[in-house]
UniProtKB/Swiss-Prot annotation:
Organism: Macaca fascicularis
EC number: 2.5.1.114
Protein's name according to its UniProt entry: tRNA wybutosine-synthesizing protein 2 homolog
UniProt keyword annotation of tRNA processing present: yes
InterPro entries tied to this protein: MeTrfase_TRM5/TYW2 (IPR030382), SAM-dependent_MTases_sf (IPR029063), TRM5-TYW2-like_MTfase (IPR056743), TRM5/TYW2-like_N (IPR056744), TYW2_N (IPR056745)
């Protein structure tokens, strides 16, 4: 009758709702039992009172067991002569209150219930430290780095993560850290629950598989991936200088119809994922992976289009981007950049890197074709609306000048550059925007 019931870890790892402990008694004692449990703050309001097959009633309680003293109190004082015992509800039914909650509210309720069941006082500090948003990859949830930072969490053990996963309906949890500054864009992600970090994600009909603990995936880039997928690149050869797991390589191959892509990547984990993603999307025969530092790439005079998808800046890749463009016809550079637009802050000219000073001599004259008043044109010469922010246009013009200089030195003759389009991707803060500059680069006709 009075045996304690403890929820097993095996049940938690199945991905089903975590079993809830309940007090079972006869229907005629249900109301008195419930009132007592509510007064003692032991009644679980997130799950329904259930009727058992034998006609008795199960009242869900907080925590993983109910001390014997409470069972004795129920039998002897709350309802003298009553009988009760503990059981487990393997598939507890959420209460109407719980069903009406948002995922964040449900998480708060479930975690607070579990924490208090462990004898730890729930506080405003702990509630403020819960995540408000996350990324879902199938049965894995990726939490942001700014949650679960309070010291109290560290003493609660791994069952905390089982509770979080159950509340949010997943089987695995990971927590994001800062991206590695080593240039490989390796995310500092910690796996909190589960035995591996491999996930699948479908984006615009393209299947990506990758390990979230080793490779990045940005949901915020979907607008740019959709845009490049809509381009007509039939017959074109592309160079993707920062291919990753195939963020842009795959849309260009699968949807834009590129003839061939040279994909550069130096993160070995991303290369494994990229190779796999090319295979599962049926385009492996139209892509060559170049593993290593793209600044040492031996390709030249080959590309109709170059993707420079690295933020906050892809400047280190500009010289090699100029090198791989076709010498006879040129091509288009898609240059990603984070641009600041703080009110009252003057735009500073781009610094010339040490590498460029050593390897690229700057000519006296360059040829550019900057459009006035912030307007841009597409590849058909159609006027587009002005850039939303003047800082974007000023950065684009500065980048255009730098690229024109590099092109003349790399190819030994003047080139003409033209801003085709400035595409906003997303904002990281009120005054930091991720944009993409489409820059057309063409060799000037030889004179006489």
């Amino acid at each position: 009758m009075g045996e304690n019931v403890v929820v097993s870890n095996m049940e938690r790892e199945t991905g089903k709702p975590v079993a809830v402990v309940a007090v079972v008694t006869e229907p005629r004692f249900t109301q008195r039992y419930r009132e007592y449990l509510e007064r003692q703050k032991l009644f679980d309001t997130q799950h329904r009172v259930e009727k058992m097959p034998d006609g008795w009633v199960a009242l869900p309680v907080l925590g993983e067991t109910l001390p014997e003293q409470h069972l004795q109190e129920l039998r002897n004082r709350v309802a003298p002569g009553s009988a009760c015992m503990l059981t487990r509800l393997p598939d507890p039914v959420p209460s109407k209150r719980a069903q009406g909650c948002s995922p964040a509210q449900k998480l708060c309720l479930e975690v607070s219930r579990w924490v208090e069941g462990r004898g730890v006082k729930w506080s405003a500090e702990l509630e403020a430290d819960l995540p408000r948003s996350w990324q879902r990859h199938g049965n894995l949830l990726l939490l942001s780095e700014d949650c679960f930072q309070a010291n109290q969490w560290k003493n609660l053990g791994p069952e905390l993560w089982e509770t979080v996963a159950s509340a949010l309906g997943v089987q695995r949890l990971a927590k994001r850290g800062r991206v590695s500054p080593d240039g490989t864009r390796t995310p500092a992600v910690t796996l909190l629950l589960g035995d591996h970090g491999w996930v699948e994600h479908v984006d615009n009909g393209i299947l990506y598989k990758f390990d979230v603990t080793q490779c990045m995936f940005s949901f915020g880039n979907i607008t740019e991936k959709l845009r490049v997928a809509s381009l007509s690149c039939a017959g074109e050869v592309l160079v993707d200088l920062y291919a990753g797991i195939g963020y842009f390589t795959l849309p260009f191959l699968v949807h834009a119809g590129a003839a061939f892509v040279h994909a550069c990547e130096w993160n070995p984990h991303a290369v494994v994922a990229l190779r796999n993603n090319l295979e599962i999307n049926g385009v492996a025969d139209r892509c060559q992976i170049h593993f290593g530092d793209n600044r040492k790439l031996k390709l030249s005079n080959i590309a109709d289009r170059v993707i420079l998808g690295l933020i906050p800046s892809s400047e280190e890749g500009w010289p090699i981007a100029c090198q791989v463009l076709r010498q006879d016809a040129g091509g288009i550079l898609h240059i990603h950049q984070n641009v600041e637009s703080f009110p009252g802050k003057n735009l500073q000219p781009l610094e010339v890197s040490k590498t460029e000073k050593e390897h690229w001599l700057y000519p006296q004259q360059i040829t550019t074709n900057q459009w006035k008043n912030g307007a841009t044109r597409d590849t058909r010469g159609k006027m587009l609306s002005p850039a939303t922010k003047p800082e974007w246009q000023r950065w684009a013009e500065s980048a255009e000048t730098r690229i024109a200089t590099l092109l003349q030195q790399v190819h030994g003759k003047p080139w003409k550059t033209q801003i085709l389009h400035i595409q906003p991707v997303k904002s990281y803060a009120p005054h930091v925007d991720h944009i993409v500059l489409d820059l057309e680069c063409c060799p000037c006709p030889s004179v006489g």
